[in-house]
């Protein structure tokens, strides 16, 4: 019986993942399978069932939700492969319906980044579930640290709150959602039922290099990426003593493919191997990041996806037939080879083991994966200049390409500078004199082609005339503004600060001053007439009568004769400011009655000047006009009518 093809295996696995995640309405489902060469859990297949930001399709008709999710899962995988392959291969033209990184939601980014992770048995949620052969349920995945969940930073960004890893016969099924769900054993049984009847134990890899009958991987699901072992000694396996000979022969084959290692790197490898055997493997990729883009802790909520990193150009030495996107659990060692003139980093194919820290390696893996994904996008941008730096030093090797000696001076330039100085310096102190000289103005048009005139900035007579007009107009406006400022300071009653209001208030103030002058002159004449005992008419326009002091013939006293005074009311309202002038016969409590009447009219008095002379009451009131309940203000006619009702109009 023939084994199933890889396409059938992938479709079968994806159908099971699709059925499982859609039955529980979670966000995504993944299958982690054992890599037969490295004996670690790697990404086998997945199905995305979450929110979609931008749909890109070439199909003319609408598709169902299931077909859209299936197509989205395939597009996400194609996007990751195209971006990862762009690290070493030149980018190829992609179809117009292909996704771009800016088309993804945060949950799609989480699904895409999961492809780059790998888990040794006992490490991470999938590794623990596989090693213990029991499920692992994590609630609040976006709130824990990287020790508990190595993808905590991604989960925090995508708001993935619940992650469940369920071991099956030949791998681990991971399913996640953006909702916070508590552990449920019936849920575990339900999801496991989709896989328990379809998978069988994969055949064991042949331990003898002479056997070719056994396949190297399970035929039920084919890994999408071939994985290579950078150093077999770094992988802890139970039958280490039984497979020493096989590993030595495999090492010889690897040396033929990848080339001989440097002696210095071999020494580091031997020392690092003894350290790494006692430590727990981590999840790292083959790109080392500079210190300025390492992510300190997932708890701070930092997200450096949009930062402009300095990218490292990794050159894989060895057989080109090897897959470029292979994964290892090792870190790059120090660079021993010197930098060449073009500052390109030449990395040795050998890698070194280092002791593991608590959080550095998980965060480094996250930063490295983001850089690998986005590197192809940044390379396409013409506005970014890349310089390759060493990860071990902040300095670069000096080369003569960076030093450009200054070019020898051009004799023509020196001559031009000398001429410019000779023509310009003599006219610096005589510039004002030349501009005001009539002779210069007359000859400016004739000598317009003179180079000295051009150097002095001379123009045509029309230009000079226009410039003079502009300067004159500017000075006139400045003087006018200064005078308005002085006028505003002289007028005590200014309603607004614009020029028209200042002029209007000034005119009104002058009228008031004129009336006061007339009143004072009238009083002076009245006082003089009282002294002489002669009746004096004030004037034809005033229509006033004053008290005349007459002496009787017997000299028994002075009798005051009261005459009638015509009442006068003047009201001026400008917006909310009001000025009221009242002149009438004196009455007890008249000023109080006037102020109460103004209060009823929603007029607030802010200043009062009043006087009483020979029974004549004169008052000047300044007030603010307020709006009534209807939003309207009282008019001048209404104020006059109200005041005329309370002031006396004839002699009592």
From Swiss-Prot:
BP term (GO), one: regulation of primary metabolic process
One Pfam family recorded for the sequence: HLH
Top-rank taxon: Eukaryota
Biased composition (Polar residues): 437-451
Region described as Disordered: spans on this chain: 233-271, 431-463
Alphabetized UniProt keyword annotations: Activator, Flavonoid biosynthesis, Nucleus, Transcription, Transcription regulation
Listed GO CC annotations: nucleus
Subcellular location: Nucleus
GO MF annotation terms: protein dimerization activity
Bias (Acidic residues) ranges: 241-264
bHLH domain segment(s): 464-513
Protein family membership: Belongs to the bHLH protein family.
Extra information: Corresponds to one of the seven genes studied by Gregor Mendel in 1866. The white flowered cv. Cameor (a allele) has a truncated non-functional BHLH protein (AC E3SXU5) due to a point mutation resulting in a mis-spliced transcript.
Function according to Swiss-Prot or TrEMBL: Transcription activator involved in the control of flavonoid pigmentation.
Protein name: Basic helix-loop-helix protein A
Organism: Pisum sativum (Garden pea)
Classification lineage: Eukaryota, Viridiplantae, Streptophyta, Embryophyta, Tracheophyta
């Amino acid at each position: 019986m023939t084994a199933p093809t890889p396409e059938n295996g992938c479709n079968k696995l994806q159908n099971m993942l699709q059925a499982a995640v859609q039955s529980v309405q979670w966000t995504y489902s993944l299958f982690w399978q054992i890599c037969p060469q490295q004996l670690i859990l790697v990404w086998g297949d997945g199905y995305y069932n979450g929110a979609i930001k931008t749909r890109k399709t070439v199909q003319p008709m609408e598709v169902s939700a299931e077909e859209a999710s299936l197509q989205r899962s395939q597009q996400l995988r194609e996007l990751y492969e195209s971006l990862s392959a762009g690290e070493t291969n030149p980018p190829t033209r992609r179809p117009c319906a292909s996704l771009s990184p800016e088309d993804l939601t945060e949950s799609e980014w989480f699904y895409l980044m999961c492809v780059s992770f790998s888990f040794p048995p006992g490490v991470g949620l999938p590794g623990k579930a596989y090693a213990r052969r029991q499920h692992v349920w994590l609630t609040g995945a976006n709130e824990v640290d990287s020790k508990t969940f190595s993808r905590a930073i991604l989960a925090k960004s995508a708001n993935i709150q619940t992650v469940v890893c369920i071991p099956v016969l030949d791998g681990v099924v991971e399913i996640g959602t953006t909702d916070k769900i508590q552990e449920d054993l019936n849920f575990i049984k339900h999801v496991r039922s989709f896989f328990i009847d379809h998978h069988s134990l994969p055949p064991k890899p042949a331990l003898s290099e002479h056997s070719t009958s056994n396949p190297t991987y399970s035929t039920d699901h084919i890994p999408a990426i071939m994985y290579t072992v950078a150093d077999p000694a770094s992988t802890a396996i139970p039958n280490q003593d039984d497979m020493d000979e096989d590993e030595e022969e495999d090492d010889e084959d690897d040396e033929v493919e990848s080339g001989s290692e440097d002696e210095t790197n071999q020494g580091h490898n031997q020392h690092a191997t003894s350290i790494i055997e006692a430590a727990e493997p981590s999840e790292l990729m083959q790109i080392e990041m500079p210190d300025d883009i390492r992510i300190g802790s997932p708890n701070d909520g930092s997200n450096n996806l949009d930062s402009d990193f300095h990218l490292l150009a990794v050159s894989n030495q060895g057989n080109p037939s090897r897959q470029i996107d292979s994964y290892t659990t090792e870190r790059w060692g120090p660079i021993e080879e010197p930098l060449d003139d073009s500052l390109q980093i030449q990395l040795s194919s050998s890698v070194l083991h280092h002791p593991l820290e608590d959080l550095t390696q998980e965060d480094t893996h996250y930063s490295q994966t983001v850089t690998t994904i986005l590197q192809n996008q940044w390379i396409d941008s013409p506005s970014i200049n890349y310089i390759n730096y060493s990860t071990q030093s902040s300095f670069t090797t000096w080369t003569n390409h960076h030093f450009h000696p200054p070019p020898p001076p051009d004799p023509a330039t020196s001559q031009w500078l000398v001429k410019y100085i000779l023509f310009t310096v003599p006219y610096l102190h005589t510039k004002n004199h030349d501009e005001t000289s009539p002779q210069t103005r007359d000859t400016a048009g004739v000598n317009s082609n003179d180079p000295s005139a051009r150097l002095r900035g001379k123009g045509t007579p029309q230009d000079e005339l226009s410039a003079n007009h502009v300067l004159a107009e500017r000075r006139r406006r400045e003087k006018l503004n200064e005078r308005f400022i002085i006028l505003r300071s002289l007028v005590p009653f200014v309603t607004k600060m614009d020029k028209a209001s200042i002029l209007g208030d000034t005119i009104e103030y002058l009228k008031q001053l004129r009336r006061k002058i007339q009143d004072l002159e009238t009083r002076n004449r009245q006082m003089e007439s009282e002294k002489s005992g002669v009746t004096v008419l004030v004037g034809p326009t005033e229509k006033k009568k004053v008290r005349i002091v007459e002496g009787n013939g017997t000299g028994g006293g002075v009798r005051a004769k009261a005459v009638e005074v015509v009442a006068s009311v003047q009201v001026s309202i400008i917006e909310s400011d009001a000025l009221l002038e009242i002149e009438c016969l004196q009455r007890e409590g008249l000023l109080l009655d006037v102020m109460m009447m103004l209060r009823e009219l929603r007029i607030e008095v802010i200043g009062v000047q009043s006087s009483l002379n020979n029974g004549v009451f004169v008052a000047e009131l300044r007030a603010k006009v307020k709006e009534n309940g209807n939003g309207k203000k009282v008019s001048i006619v209404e104020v006059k009518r109200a005041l005329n009702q309370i002031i006396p109009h004839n002699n009592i």
